[in-house]
């Protein structure tokens, strides 16, 4: 779970850095996601290396700050789109601040916070998050995150007219994964989730491969990688696809909890 939170935080750090640099940090609040995502990434590394079965207050605070930053960022992006001429038109949805992007740091915070709740579970006891079974709760969070990330990818790939057939993968594979996680979350104990586990691995691979496809997309712009300083800003966002990998890792962690604790 800490690795999942860290993967999401790293994606946000790189993506928001590029996009907000392109926007010249016109609003000073645009520095916030960079600072918070860097803190969240460092916190996830600390959590991964910490073997103590006790929640850490500083990690909790950082993860909650990340979640709050995601909510606030969504509000800023909604305002940015709504204030433009035409409001929530296709043109503005395509080219103004991406509505779904800040939710990635929210998800990083939620997954990280869940990891701390699982960590503080006593041996032999069912891991819970606010009295809810931990595995099923995390599966629901990861599934919802996959649907939201699919919506963001679908909007931008629709803008690109799906000119490459592989652009259909991020809008077809993740919803299936979300349904599988929802089924796992709603199902009873003792079920075999082998296919769902395999599908999460497929989504993780898709997220990594997506960064490669985006790198190829950058190379197709005028000047290719020789003109990287311009094309990396205007080409497909390199750090965006790994967010699918982060959510897939969270899904795998949820399935692992349900395997070890059938009632979790």
What are these regions (language model features)?
Residues 1-264:
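Short amphipathic, positively biased membrane-proximal segments
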